[in-house]
Amino acid sequence: MAQKKDYYEILGVPRNATEEEIKRAYRRLAKQYHPDANPGNKEAEEKFKEINEAYEVLSDPEKRKLYDQFGHAAFDPKYGAQGSGGFSGGFGGGFADFDFGSFGDIFEDLFEGFDIFGTSRRRKEAPRKGADIYVDLELTLKESVFGCEKEIPIYRTEKCSVCGGSGVKPGSAPVRCQKCGGTGQIRSRQATFFGEFTTIKTCDACGGTGTIITDPCRECGGTGNVRRQRRVKINIPAGIDDGQVITLRGEGESGIKGGPNGDLHIKIKIAPHPVFKRVGQDLYIEVPITFVNAALGGEIEIPTLDGKTKVRIEPGTQNGDEVRIKGKGVPNLRSRGRGDLVVKFIVEVPKKLTEKQKELLREFERLSSEEGYEKRKHFWDRIREAFS
């Protein structure tokens, strides 16, 4: 007779495995090698039997203790182990005398629809949360910076107000399903290698409810819910950014079997602005100025989201120079502060000049010195150093 395989090795767990680790390994293997998942596969049937034998011992603290001390001999009748907590008859006689007691909860989870213990329990559908609804909401840059209140239409399933969600016409009642006898389940027997199994399926006539609605509610047509449009108000906080999501609890689809409603998730989309660009908490604006403004300096009026304001141009301003106007940017969602407005100057050179303008510029050039052009002076200094 071939030597029995180690029970720990069968389940693929170490000898110091916890009860939860053993149970988890058993669940995985039992599902993999269950006869109903491997019809006609003798090797799978033997493996399934082996897995159950190992779990029967290792899931019981007393039996596991004996096995750790004496090995397979602890449960071999010829060694007299039966009186010490061993199996009554071992496994030689197949599954006729096999104790499935410790497997009930596991099989119930793994093989829903298979009643291997002959029970007739009916599993009730638990209350479930309704589905969430996802929508996009476009805002202007100004709305996102200062916040606002929006009202948007959404379509969602709600409990029928006429029948209260029962689907039955007020004043009438559902009748017992004749096909399943009110159990909500259809049972059939199936012969397998291990004996006769009873398969349980949801009744297709009543959908598992055990009752049939013969006089449905006219408002919902017997479904218990209706599809309606609702307008939902949303408070947009100041400083919200593109891509952020606002969640309104309980504004989603209606709950199932008395469960809570789902949630409404609003994803913010900020439309591009023709003048301003947002980067974090700051706003950026490009302001074109003449080369005369850049050279002489001065003060100009520019737009902000708060209204018009004046900004100073320093004499000698270069193309791309920036100035910051404090507190004219985007509010911080988590504090009271605001970012800045960053003004970038774009020095514009005229493409067309009159003869008089050209003459004046040539005169200006004759009167200019290298000292007035720092970048130009440094450039030629580097050239001279490089080739000297």
UniProtKB/Swiss-Prot annotation:
GO cellular component: cytoplasm
Ranges for the CXXCXGXG motif repeats: 160-167, 177-184, 203-210, 217-224
Cross-referenced InterPro entries: DnaJ (IPR012724), DnaJ_C (IPR002939), DnaJ_domain (IPR001623), DnaJ_domain_CS (IPR018253), HSP40/DnaJ_pept-bd (IPR008971), HSP_DnaJ_Cys-rich_dom (IPR001305), HSP_DnaJ_Cys-rich_dom_sf (IPR036410), J_dom_sf (IPR036869)
CDD domains to which the protein is assigned, alphabetical: DnaJ, DnaJ_C, DnaJ_zf
Residues of the J domain: 6-71
Signal peptide range in chain numbering: none
Record keywords, A-Z: Chaperone, Cytoplasm, DNA replication, Metal-binding, Repeat, Stress response, Zinc, Zinc-finger
Positions bound to Zn(2+) 2: C177, C180, C203, C206
UniProt keyword annotation of Cytoplasm present: yes
Binding sites annotated in the UniProt record for Zn(2+) 1: C160, C163, C217, C220
Domain remark text: The J domain is necessary and sufficient to stimulate DnaK ATPase activity. Zinc center 1 plays an important role in the autonomous, DnaK-independent chaperone activity of DnaJ. Zinc center 2 is essential for interaction with DnaK and for DnaJ activity.
Protein name: Chaperone protein DnaJ
Source organism: Caldicellulosiruptor bescii (strain ATCC BAA-1888 / DSM 6725 / KCTC 15123 / Z-1320)
